[in-house]
Amino acid sequence: MKQQVIIFDTTLRDGEQALQASLSVKEKLQIALALERMGVDVMEVGFPISSPGDFASVRAIAQRVKQSRVCALARCVDADIDAAAEALRAADAFRIHTFLATSTLHLESKLRRSFDDAIAMARHAILRARRYTDDVEFSCEDAGRTPIDNLCRIVEAAIDAGAKTVNIPDTVGYTTPYQFGGIIHTLFERVPNIDKAVISVHCHDDLGMACANSISAIQSGARQVEGTLNGIGERAGNCALEEVIMAIRTRQDLLRVHTGIRHQEIYRTSQLVSQLCNMPIPANKAVVGANAFAHSSGIHQDGVLKNRENYEIMTPESIGLPQTQLNLTSRSGRAAVKHRMEEMGYCEGNDFDLERLYQAFLRLADKKGQVFDYDLEALAFIDRQQEEADHFRLEYFSVQSGSSVMATASVRLICGAETRAEAATGNGPVDAVYQAISRITDISVDIVKYQLSAKGQGRDALGQVDIVAEHQGRRFHGVGLTTDIVESSAQALIHVLNHIWRARQVEQERQRLHSPVPSISTSSTH
């Protein structure tokens, strides 16, 4: 009987640490629900002690996710563990994940502790976490550079203290597949109580071997793999879970294990993570890149036409990649739009609001005539982003610009219960619109990143604008999507301003309630 490999997703913890702008609670919840739909066994969704925002995100996800086990990270510190337990309290099933550096380098230069101290700290932390749950995971940070004798000792001690999962991270992506597989093999040979815990691996991609190291670990007996969607994460990123999942599925003959993942959900979950995190997927990215199933060579094209298996080891359908690009027009009704969305795997209510989507569809169809599958997906994504009542909404804008005249913009915004208008000049039409919006809202931001991308094909493509803006030391991500790039730019900035407005409301409410959650700048890349 094939054994199952547990899929542990840390997109919302380790992955989010690498983003230029933190995700909002709503954005994290969207990703968490998509991961649940995809079937991940465990999702690590934050580091509650690190900030009130992370605490709130973990608590919100713990309240909503029912099918996956929700996990939070904590150092081997009592306050960390207590905060994690409090944030997770509402979950049907939860895990506390605590970690400690074990390599000689980290112990001497970072923690200034002996290895015996590390064992004592690990035991204490695991025992404290077990006050709240039987599901405790312990990670040996920088295990890849930890002397093997020491690693065996602390793994045995962690299991003896009650850790149900022991994680062996290659924290800095230093090991090779043969070496890393050997570490896991040695643990199984030398740790006497290893049968009482699941051995997990968490590989980083600094040398481009995170996925290969994870597969090697599976072959040596590891039965949990940690990683992120699209491989996002600190430095060069984490093991890309979609690669490990599809490697397990495609190479059943070699690996003889399976996962509980609904692999048809991989593509759209990957796209959602890319859009919300503002991290485009490289075209040549394995499994989910735009070229993953593309064939340019004449010989390859001929071979694929004769039999797809000549040059495809997996099918686009196996990851849920839509192949048909049916078009709709302004004469199409709600039923047609709903049917097409359902054919692409989206569920009304959970993934889109039909009435809002249909109204956006009609506006787009009036502008460009035909609306394709990728248009509908983009509209549904923007609809999910803007489904909360926004304080700021664009009512009207007009721009005058040319090669020999200064750009001038007139903008009218709905600001809560009132309407305000301003005009401004700028260095180009986008800057002029931004200056006018800034005057209306009286909120000053610095644009850290501005990115324009096409959604669709040819002259009818939609223009998506993603921006990262900084306000009072915090970074916010905004997105806009229309057929007009100036309007998309305006919508992206307004999206940011609504994030800022909501953040102010949350902070005011937190101060009113005198939240006890401490704000500590903390991060980990174990």
UniProtKB/Swiss-Prot annotation:
Recorded GO cellular component terms are: cytosol
Q: Name one GO molecular function term.
A: manganese ion binding
Pathway(s) of this molecule: Amino-acid biosynthesis; L-leucine biosynthesis; L-leucine from 3-methyl-2-oxobutanoate: step 1/4
- Say yes or no: keyword Transferase present: yes
Region of interest called Regulatory domain, as start-end residue ranges on this chain: 393-526
Cofactor(s) listed:
Mn(2+)
Q: What is its EC number?
A: 2.3.3.13
List ligand-binding residues for Mn(2+). Answer: D14, H202, H204, N238
Location comes to: Cytoplasm
Family annotation (SUPFAM superfamilies): 2-isopropylmalate synthase LeuA, allosteric (dimerisation) domain, Aldolase
Metal-binding recorded as keyword: yes
Subunit and interaction comment = Homodimer.
PANTHER family reported in the protein's UniProt record = 2-ISOPROPYLMALATE SYNTHASE 1, CHLOROPLASTIC-RELATED, HOMOCITRATE SYNTHASE-RELATED
Q: Which family, according to UniProt? A: Belongs to the alpha-IPM synthase/homocitrate synthase family. LeuA type 1 subfamily.
Function as written in the Swiss-Prot or TrEMBL entry: Catalyzes the condensation of the acetyl group of acetyl-CoA with 3-methyl-2-oxobutanoate (2-ketoisovalerate) to form 3-carboxy-3-hydroxy-4-methylpentanoate (2-isopropylmalate).
What is this protein's name?
Answer: 2-isopropylmalate synthase
The species is Edwardsiella ictaluri (strain 93-146)
Q: Lineage of the native species?
A: Bacteria, Pseudomonadati, Pseudomonadota, Gammaproteobacteria, Enterobacterales
